[in-house]
Amino acid sequence: AWSDQMNGAWRPISFFSENGKIELTLYSMEKEPEIHSDAPLTSELLRFRKETNDRFMFPLEKERERLEQEGKVETPEMKVLLEQFKKTKDRQELDAIRIKAHQLEKEGKAYTEEYKVFEQKSQEVYGKYREYQNEYIQSNPTLVGLYLLTRQARRMHDSDENMTTYTNLYRTVYVGKFADNPMTEYMEIWVASNEIKIGGKFVDFTAPDLQGVQYTLSEEIQGKVA
């Protein structure tokens, strides 16, 4: 949408560091990068991604492309701002355009009614995709499953009702597995941080700063409101 164009966007490429061959073909933003691999973990990740893209994502992409081709995504007011954004390089003018675009979005005047219906449908499809992915994560306690779980956890917000789902998935399926993997460390910290309550228990830990000096959490917050 407008935020992709005004704030910048990119197409990330995910693969595992493992023995095997990986071939990458990169394109501009208009086309998804191509990746092929005979390495087991990366191959399974690519297989799962293709399966879910074919089932959930590609039909949505085709529908969005149709709306874009027919000019039915942005309202006339938003189209004017997008044209202004493309033509100017002045930082103050760009900031002013972003503010106006945010205001249009806040007032529900940034997108057409047809596109709003599409957005609602997208949310429903993504919910089905997330359920399907959760089943895979639970049934396949591999590094691929842990990667998908970690990626989903990184996207969570504090108010997200699915946070408990991912916490339980980690606790019941992945605790004790892949102890030396950085994704395990991330999930341990993520789960612990989301369980911190005022007056409640917390996981104490020690970590260095940029100069290598060690600091312990319990010592740093002693006598303070944390």
Kindly give the residue locations of the regions a language model identified:
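Extracytoplasmic/periplasmic, Sec-exported soluble proteins
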Residues: 121-124, 162, 219
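A non-transmembrane, solvent-exposed segment enriched in polar/low-complexity residues
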Residues: 1-120
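Intrinsically disordered, low-complexity segments enriched in polar/charged residues with Gly/Pro
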Residues: 64, 122-123, 191-195
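Extended amphipathic alpha-helical segments
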Residues: 111, 118, 122-129, 133
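N-terminal targeting signals for export/organelle localization
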Residues: 24, 128-198
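Alpha/beta-hydrolase fold active-site loops
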Residues: 224-226
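N-terminal "domain-start" segment that seeds a small globular fold
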Residues: 185-221
